C-alpha cells in the first residue's frame, strides 16, 4: 500500500489577488503533488463554506485559518491512509469536519487536500490524472464555453448578465474549436475598439464594455463570428450565464432599469432564443425561485440547455430534488461548491444517470492549477467552462486539454 506520509498547506494568491489555499501531499513512495483551490465571486447560498480569516490582513480575505486546519487537523486525520482510496480519504475529512458544508474546517481546506491526494496518486501510478479518476472510459474532450463578454459580478460595467459565451460545436477536434473561438475573440476586440468601447477584461478574460442593454453583446458577438469567417448557428452557438440570483429582489428581477416577473423574464429569453442561436442559459432564474424554474423548464427545456449553478451548487441532494421536480436539464460542476473530489464525482454520476448534461467549471478567482481540465475528461462531462483565451489562469486549462488531445480522446462537437 502507498500511504499518505505528509500533508502541508500554504497561503498563495489567486487571479484576483486574493489569498487561497495550496495543499501539498507527499506519499510513502516519495511522490509529491500540490493543488490550488479556486474561489467564486457570484456564489450560491447553499455552497460549501469557504473559510476566510475576516481580520485586517488582505481586507479580511486571508485563509490562514484554513491553512492551519490543513496543517494541524486534516494532516493528522489522513496521514497513514491509502493514497489510492480517494473515497476513504474524502470520507475521513467529511467526518472530521462534522457538518454538511464544511463550516468547521472550510471547503477550501478540504478540497485542496482532496485534489492534491488525487494528483499524487495518479503521479505515483505514472498515469494521467484524467485516466486515474475516470478509468478506461475517460475519452471525451469537452466543448468549451468561452466567456468573451463579461458583466454582472464579474465586471464593473453596465451589463446585467454575467457572461456572454460562444460554443464552437462545428469542428472535428478540440484544437480546431479552440482556434475558432480565439479568432472570434480577437475579432471582437477589433470591433469593440472600432466602436470606441473599452477592451478591458473582466475576471474571466472576457471584455467588459459599457453597452446599452443585454442584447447588444449578442449582436456584437454575432458580428465577430461572421467577420472572423465562421457560421453562426452551425459552427458557433451562443450561451448565457444570467446569474439571476444577483438580480432577484423582492420577488422580481431587476435589469435594464425595469422589473420583471418570472414569467416576463422567461418571455424575454424566448424572444432572445428566436433571434439568436442560443444553446445554453445558465441560472436563468434565481436559486430561490423554484416555481419559476419549473415554468422555465416547461417552456424552454426542450429547446435550450438550462443550467443550474447557484440552483444546484454541485450538491447531490439538491440536484436529486431538482430531478424529482423536473427543474432544469443541466448542472454546472464546480468542485469547490461541494468540497471534495468524491462528492463532485457523485453529483456528476447522478446527473448523467438522469439525463442531465454536466458542464465542468472554473471560478472567477482561479490559478495556474488545471485540475478541472483533467476532471472534465475523466467524467466525460462533454462541456467545460473556463473563460476566454486571454488570461494565463484560463489558458492553463485550455493548454492542458490540448495536451490531453494528443494522448487520447474524441471531440464531441455537434454530437454533444
Curated annotation (Swiss-Prot):
The cysteines joined by S-S bonds are none
Q: Which cofactor does it need?
A: Mg(2+)
Q: Where in the cell is it found?
A: Cytoplasm; Secreted; Cell surface
| Pathway(s) served | Carbohydrate degradation; glycolysis; pyruvate from D-glyceraldehyde 3-phosphate: step 4/5
Q: Its Gene Ontology molecular function terms?
A: magnesium ion binding; phosphopyruvate hydratase activity
Main location, first listed in the record: cytoplasm
Tell me the PROSITE patterns matching this sequence: ENOLASE (PS00164)
An example of a Gene Ontology cellular component annotation for this protein is: extracellular region
What Gene Ontology terms for biological process does this UniProt record contain?
A: glycolytic process
Q: Which CDD domains does the record associate with it?
A: enolase
Q: Where does Mg(2+) bind?
A: 241, 282, 309
Q: Which positions are catalytic residues?
A: 204, 334
Q: What class of enzyme is it?
A: lyase
Pfam families cross-referenced by the UniProt entry = Enolase_C, Enolase_N
Annotated residues that bind (2R)-2-phosphoglycerate are located at 162, 334, 363-364, 385
Entry note: cofactor: Binds a second Mg(2+) ion via substrate during catalysis.
- Report the protein's function: Catalyzes the reversible conversion of 2-phosphoglycerate (2-PG) into phosphoenolpyruvate (PEP). It is essential for the degradation of carbohydrates via glycolysis.
The record's listing under HAMAP family reads: Enolase
Family of the protein in this entry: Belongs to the enolase family.
Q: What is this protein called?
A: Enolase
What organism does this protein naturally occur in? Campylobacter concisus (strain 13826)
Query: What gene is this protein a product of?
Result: eno
